[in-house]
C-alpha cells in the first residue's frame, strides 16, 4: 500500500513498538520519541489509504470525454502538477506559470521522514549512554528484574548495593567527568528534541512552499475563521486547475479542467494540527529542560523524593554531603527516574540502603581518625631489684628494667633504692 517505502514504514513501526515499553523515559520523552512519531505514522497510513484505495482528486471533464477518458484525466492530474487560481481571476499564462501544487504526492514519504526525525535523538542518546558509568536503562532494567525475582525489600537492597558500587567507582576515578556523564547525555537528548522541532518547522516551510514560519496562524485565521478558502488559500487549495493535451487526428488540443482536491482537505487538517502540536512540543520540551537544569544545578535535594534529615544518623550537613559528594549529578538523575518508574515508596527504600552504606562509611572513617588521635598512656621504666635473687642478678639473667604503665613516673624514693 505504501509503495517502495513500505519497508521503511514497517521498520519504523517496529522501532516504535520497542520504544513503547522503555523505562528510561519521562512524559516529555515519550511525547517526543514515541507518541508524536506514532501519530505521524498513523497519518501516513490514513493518507496512503486515501491515495491508493480512495479518490484523491476528482476533475470536471468536457462532455465529449468518455468514461475511460475521465479516468485518464483524474490520474493524469494527480501525478502531474496542478496550480491554483482564485475564483474570479482570469486564467492567463502568467497564472499557469505561478505556484504549482505538487506536494500532496509526497506527503506519506515526508511524514515517515518526519517520524524518523523524532525517533533519531533517542537512538543517538541510546548509543552513547551505554558507555556511561551510570547506565539509566541498564540500572532500571536491573531493578525491574530484581523486583520480579526477589522480595521487594531484598530487591531494593540489592539495587542499592549496585548503585553504591557504581557511585564508588565514580568517586575513586581520577576523571571528574564520570560524575555527570549520564546527566550531560540526558541534556543532549533534550536539546536534540528541541533542535528537531526547529528542523521540523523549517521542513514544513519549504515542503509546503510558504512564505514564513507563522503560516499556520495566518491560514487558520484567513481560511478557517474568515471562510476565504476559494479566494486566498494557496497552501491547501480545494479547487485547482490542471492542463493536459490530447492528440486527435494528428493535432494536439490543450484542455484545462477544474479539479477538486479531496485529499487536500485531509492533508490540510492534519498539517494544521501538526503545526500547532510542534509548537506545543517545542514549548513543553524547552520548559522541561530549563526546569530540570535549574533543579540539578541549584536544587538537587528537591529531586530526592524523601527527607534525608529524617533518616537514621543523618543531619543537614550529612545530607548535603551525601547529595553533593556521593550521589553527584548522575546519582540524583537515576533516583529521579526510579521515582518516576517505580514510585516514591520503592525509591525511599533504595535511598535507605544508600544512606545506610553512607553512614557506615562515615562512622568507620571517624572511628579510624579517633583511634589515631586519642591519647595513649605514657610508659616509664623503673629499676626493680627487690625480688631478684643475688645469683641471677650477678649473672644478669633477669632484666633490670620493668615497664610501668601510668600517667606519671613512680615516686623518686622507689627509684633510688640501692641494688
From Swiss-Prot:
Q: Where in the cell is it found?
A: Cell membrane; Cell junction, Gap junction
Name any one Pfam family assigned in the record.
Innexin
InterPro entries assigned: Innexin
Tell me which UniProt keywords the record has, alphabetically.
Cell junction, Cell membrane, Gap junction, Ion channel, Ion transport, Membrane, Transmembrane, Transmembrane helix, Transport
Membrane-spanning parts: 33-53, 108-128, 184-204, 270-290
Predominant subcellular localization, coarse grouping: membrane
A cellular component term from Gene Ontology for this protein is:
plasma membrane
Superkingdom as given in the UniProt entry: Eukaryota
Gene Ontology MF terms: gap junction channel activity; gap junction hemi-channel activity
Membrane topology listed for this record: Multi-pass membrane protein
**UniProt record, GO biological process:** monoatomic ion transmembrane transport
The protein's matches in PANTHER family, at most eight in alphabetical order, are given as: INNEXIN, INNEXIN-2
Question: What's this protein's family per the entry?
Answer: Belongs to the pannexin family.
Q: What does this protein do?
A: Structural component of the gap junctions.
Protein name from the UniProt record: Innexin-2
